């Protein structure tokens, strides 16, 4: 036993616990040769205490029991934790070995970055590249591509037979409880690398974590431990980090930064991303057991670039394909809806049959026979569908297994070629692989032949990609997939259903949106920007909301700002956030945060002329470049927003009777006067960036009647829950229009009239019981006033159906 080899302590005359502890501390620990590793000094110090003879029981009542089991527990710990592997093997992962085993995804493109990395690694000193790029652009893939090239021998002679080891920084730092533990681990790694004589390239992902790693009181961090080896060229290291983290952490340490040569990994183009997706397609098909259509790959690249603006290609496009494939795979593993529906119907019939089993009347017997026949038919349908589902699953699994075998055969071909076994390589290339390809083609052909009647959808299509986009961004799928031609041609008609009497404004908005959708405007600008001018109550704000309904299928997709809150200059900072040193710096800007959370919305600046003039300067970048930088330095994307500014500038010109026709329309001369008035308020560079300035007409009586119909439909929607139908006579509608018509105030007086003359009396009728649920309410004119006709006398209460049955049950 281990305890028998530890030197025995001397007998003490004192009986205090402190005396025994002091003795244990003074005893030399000479058992290092019995330990499999160097991290058990603390446990052996404890064991020294327990090996002291004649410890009085009052001092340590449980010491003797623990002493007998401690060596065995220590040996178990040593068995579990002891690890005599080399440090590189313990704390690293061999990328070249993974590439040799075919476990790395193929790397498409990135030739320039890989070649630049090889050039730096081939230097005599400071042969340390650091890959810098945005998250998701493929920095780690560059090193994986280099590992694959080393295995295939597609590198210069100086790079052949080299190993790329990925260091696990978390594994190095974990367990380093005492001062010196971390340093000894790292030094052992560096020693092993130097012993390899330049055959090992260390790769550290999240390279900026080296700064301060292992830093504690009286110790130095990892970056300072690495500097001497990096400078001498004895250590070849490659790092990967983002641009922001490199600037924030690495560049501050000039001594470390100069030992590395940056390699910029830029975001690939959409075309390059499509090529990358095509290269990864087979891996994802084998993993998920589905077929990925080429159109889905193109859609993933295009839609991710257009709609996911806070991430980078190719990562976001790969995620779309992966999630769509995963969703389809889960559908294969779950029961189809048709089978689940039949199963529920069978359960319902069986429950009803059980309740009718004891009934003896003729009606129940007939019902029971009918249900038994129906149950038999349903069970037959269920069995047929279940057999079909299992058959389709087997067919899909067969294709998946064949593709897996094909991938394995390709790996074996590459391995045989690399090892020089050309006979085996020939058999695989000209026999096994063609046979598997024919098998996959035949299985896929059988699937396509029965596709019309299939329960399972086995191909990832553009619709599946659009569904994932919809979940991630909130854009309705039908907006992405519906033919843009039909939708845009109907835009004028759809907008006129909610914005009345403003045909010219609707046409201007529709034309601007069509221009953008046709791709004839700059992609770096917002979808469109408008300034709506006109008298109050003419539908300027409603126009912005209707635009949101058309584009985003959500009338609430409007980020609205009341400009009366931004009259002072200092309040403008609320939109982008307070500068450093001011109260509220930690909080995000109201405008930037709203657009970041809802990037697909209509941004409405209501009553724009009431804001401070400097606000127009803030919007110059938004209108021209489609972006705005907040107080934290984050760039917010406005490319998928529509900017709408409403203003009452020039309304005194529009309200003059001599300047408008009877139908409320204005002529071009009056419009020119309004625009001239606008130029006195805003700088030319601001007005020049707005796509279109729309002048709204004054509302006519005809337009007000259409608005009344819209408001009555809205009131009817509110009464649906009470199952009340509202009916107005033509006379009542005409009287309401006459009472609510005021050219100066637009449609808002009509809302007040409806509330005072219609809704308030209707509320009184409901409260008094004169109008009940599930009834029709008539509204007519009586004595030249709006009159809501009561259906019952005051205080009348009709029993509800459930109350009637409740009373009947109580009587029984």
UniProtKB/Swiss-Prot annotation:
Residues 337-425 form a coiled coil. The keyword Metal-binding does not apply. ATP 1 binds at residues 133-140. GO terms for biological process: cellular response to heat; mitochondrial genome maintenance; protein refolding; protein stabilization; protein unfolding. Keywords: ATP-binding, Chaperone, Coiled coil, Mitochondrion, Nucleotide-binding, Repeat, Stress response, Transit peptide. CDD domains: AAA (cd00009), RecA-like_ClpB_Hsp104-like (cd19499). It comes from the Eukaryota. The keyword Kinase does not apply. InterPro entries: AAA+_ATPase, ATPase_AAA_core, Clp_ATPase_C, ClpA/B, ClpA/B_CS1, ClpA/B_CS2, ClpA/ClpB_AAA_lid, ClpA_ClpB. PROSITE patterns: CLPAB_1, CLPAB_2. GO terms for molecular function: ATP binding; ATP hydrolysis activity; misfolded protein binding. It is found in: Mitochondrion matrix. GO terms for cellular component: cytoplasm; mitochondrial matrix. Residues 1-73 form a transit peptide. ATP 2 binds at residues 534-541. Residues 88-336 are annotated as: NBD1. Required, in concert with mitochondrial Hsp70, for the dissociation, resolubilization and refolding of aggregates of damaged proteins in the mitochondrial matrix after heat stress. May extract proteins from aggregates by unfolding and threading them in an ATP-dependent process through the axial channel of the protein hexamer, after which they can be refolded by the Hsp70 chaperone system. Required for resumption of mitochondrial respiratory function, DNA synthesis and morphology after heat stress. Has 2 AAA ATPase type nucleotide-binding domains (NBDs) per monomer. NBD1 is primarily responsible for ATP hydrolysis. NBD2 is crucial for oligomerization. PANTHER family: ATP-DEPENDENT CLP PROTEASE (PTHR11638), HEAT SHOCK PROTEIN 78, MITOCHONDRIAL (PTHR11638:SF176). Homohexamer, forming a ring with a central pore. This is Heat shock protein 78, mitochondrial. It comes from Candida albicans (strain SC5314 / ATCC MYA-2876). The gene is HSP78.
């Amino acid at each position: 036993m281990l305890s028998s080899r530890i030197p025995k302590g001397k007998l003490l005359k004192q009986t205090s616990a402190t005396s025994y502890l002091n003795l244990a501390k003074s005893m030399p620990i000479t058992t290092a040769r019995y330990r499999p590793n160097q991290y058990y000094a603390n446990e052996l110090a404890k064991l020294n205490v327990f090996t002291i003879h004649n410890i009085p029981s009052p001092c340590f009542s449980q010491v003797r029991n623990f002493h007998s089991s401690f060596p065995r527990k220590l040996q178990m710990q040593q068995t579990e934790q002891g690890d005599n592997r080399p440090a590189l093997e313990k704390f690293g992962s061999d990328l070249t070995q993974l590439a040799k085993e075919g476990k790395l995804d193929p790397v498409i493109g990135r030739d320039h970055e890989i070649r630049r990395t090889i050039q730096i690694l081939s230097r005599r000193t400071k042969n340390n590249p650091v890959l810098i790029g945005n998250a998701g652009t493929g920095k780690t893939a560059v090193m994986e591509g280099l590992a694959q090239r080393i295995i295939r021998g597609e590198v210069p002679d100086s790079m052949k037979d080299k190993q790329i080891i990925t260091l696990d920084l978390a594994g190095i730092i974990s367990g380093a409880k005492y001062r010196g533990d971390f340093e000894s681990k790292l030094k052992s790694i560096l020693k092993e690398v130097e012993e390899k004589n330049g055959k090992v390239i260390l790769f550290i992902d999240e390279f900026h974590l080296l700064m301060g790693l292992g830093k504690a009181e009286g110790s130095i961090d990892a970056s300072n431990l690495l500097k001497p080896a990096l400078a001498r060229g004895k250590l070849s290291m490659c790092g990967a980090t983002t641009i922001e983290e490199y600037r924030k952490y690495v560049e501050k340490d000039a001594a470390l930064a100069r030992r590395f040569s940056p390699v910029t990994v830029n975001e690939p183009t959409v075309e390059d991303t499509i090529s990358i997706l095509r290269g990864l397609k087979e891996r994802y098909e084998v993993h998920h057991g589905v077929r990925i259509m080429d159109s889905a790959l193109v859609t993933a690249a295009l839609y991710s670039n257009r709609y996911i603006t806070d991430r980078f290609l190719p990562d976001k496009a790969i995620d779309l394909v992966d999630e769509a494939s995963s969703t389809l795979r889960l559908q294969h593993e779950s029961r189809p809806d048709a089978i689940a529906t039949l199963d529920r119907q069978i359960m319902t019939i069986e429950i009803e049959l059980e309740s009718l089993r004891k009934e003896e009347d003729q009606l129940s017997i007939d019902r029971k026979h009918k249900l038994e026949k129906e149950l038999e038919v349903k069970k037959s349908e269920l069995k047929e569908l279940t057999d079909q589902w299992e058959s389709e699953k087997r067919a899909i699994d067969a294709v998946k297994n064949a593709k897996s075998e094909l991938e394995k055969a390709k790996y074996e071909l590459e391995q045989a070629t690399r090892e020089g076994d050309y006979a085996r390589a020939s058999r695989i290339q000209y026999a096994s692989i063609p046979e598997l390809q024919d098998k996959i083609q035949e299985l896929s052909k059988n699937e396509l032949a029965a596709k019309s009647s299939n329960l399972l959808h086995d191909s990832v299509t553009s619709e599946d990609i659009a569904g994932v986009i919809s979940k991630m961004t909130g854009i309705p799928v039908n907006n992405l997939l519906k033919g843009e031609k039909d939708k845009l041609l109907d835009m004028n008609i759809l907008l006129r259903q909610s914005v009345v009497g403003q045909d010219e404004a609707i046409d201007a908005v529709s034309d601007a949106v069509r221009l953008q959708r046709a791709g004839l405007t700059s992609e770096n600008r917002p979808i469109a920007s408008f300034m709506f001018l006109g008298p109050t109550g003419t539908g300027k704000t409603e126009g912005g909301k209707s635009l949101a309904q058309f584009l985003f299928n959500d009338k609430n997709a409007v980020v609205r700002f009341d400009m009366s809150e931004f009259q002072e200059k200092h309040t403008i900072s609320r939109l982008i956030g307070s500068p450093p040193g001011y109260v509220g710096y930690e909080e995000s800007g109201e405008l930037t945060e709203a657009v970041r959370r809802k990037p697909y919305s209509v941004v409405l600046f209501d009553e724009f002329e009431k804001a401070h003039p400097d606000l127009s300067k803030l919007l110059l970048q938004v209108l021209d470049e489609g972006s705005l930088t907040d107080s934290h330095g984050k760039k917010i994307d406005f490319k998928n927003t529509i900017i709408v500014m409403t203003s009452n500038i020039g309304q005194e010109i529009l309200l003059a009777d001599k300047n408008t026709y009877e139908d409320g329309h204005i002529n071009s001369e009056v419009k020119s006067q309004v625009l001239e008035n606008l130029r006195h308020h805003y700088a030319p560079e601001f007005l020049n960036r707005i796509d279109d300035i729309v002048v709204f007409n004054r509302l006519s009586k005809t337009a007000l009647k259409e608005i009344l119909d819209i408001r009555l439909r809205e009131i009817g929607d509110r009464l649906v829950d009470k199952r009340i139908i509202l009916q107005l006579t033509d006379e009542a509608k005409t009287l309401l229009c006459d009472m609510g018509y005021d050219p100066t105030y637009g449609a808002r007086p009509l809302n007040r009239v409806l509330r005072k003359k219609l809704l308030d009396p209707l509320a009184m009728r409901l409260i008094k019981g004169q109008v009940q649920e599930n009834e029709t309410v008539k509204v007519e004119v009586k004595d030249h006033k709006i009159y809501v006709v009561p259906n019952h006398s005051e205080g009348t209460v009709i029993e509800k159906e459930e109350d009637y049955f409740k009373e009947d049950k109580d009587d029984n």
